[in-house]
Amino acid sequence: PASAQQTPPEPPSPAWIQEFNSLPEATRKSYIDQFRKAEQLFAQKRTMECLFSLTELEKLYAGNPGLYNLRGACYIEIRNIEKALENFEKAQKLDPSNLTIQFNLAEAHYVNHDYARALKAFTELLPPFKDNPGMTPLLQFKRYICARKLDNRPLAKELENLYGPMDDTPYYYCTQAIIKFMGGDKDAAQEQLLSAIRIHGGTSAIQAFTDAMTEAGILPSPYGQTVPTEQPAKTGLEKRR
């Protein structure tokens, strides 16, 4: 039958996209071009310029969740966690199903040492990332650190041996390093970390894992402080001219 051959209708665009598409074409084009430049400024670590650019963009159109996600990422960079949380929360209200925004919000709670909220948020992210071999171990590792910080021993014990030394993730060596560090054996902890770096060095995973340890105060930072390296979410605007 003909009906069986028809393509199913596409799900409706989010409300903010529909609203954006109702703007004059010249405004949309200008906004998209300026937003891309703001993303480039962020990637180049020109954080204050990026923040200024976002203020100007907000005057053109204030409903883009990507704007608040990017602004939140800027505030994480300059360690204004309160402002970061405020912007990530605004982004999430505008785009509740965006996983990058959800992760950034969880990360902001983590950086703020609000381990109870961070643990809840990272746990909620596990199902949507279950098929992602890179993200799942990182989420579980952050849950492990939260559990240790909250003195949730049953959960920490459960997560300790989630991965082994042969798995394609630094998880095992980094959890072992934390066990040694928190037990006062710094030399043994350094050995575990060196194993992780020797095996997984040069990968983005080792950077993410050691950053997580630094943010929690388990590892000292060589720069005094570290910042998350997550990229802001794509906005959906880049395909809509």
Model-predicted segments: where are they?
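Solenoid-like repeat scaffolds
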Residues: 20-25, 55-62, 89-96, 124-133, ...
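Canonical tetratricopeptide repeat
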Residues: 69-70, 104, 140-143, 175
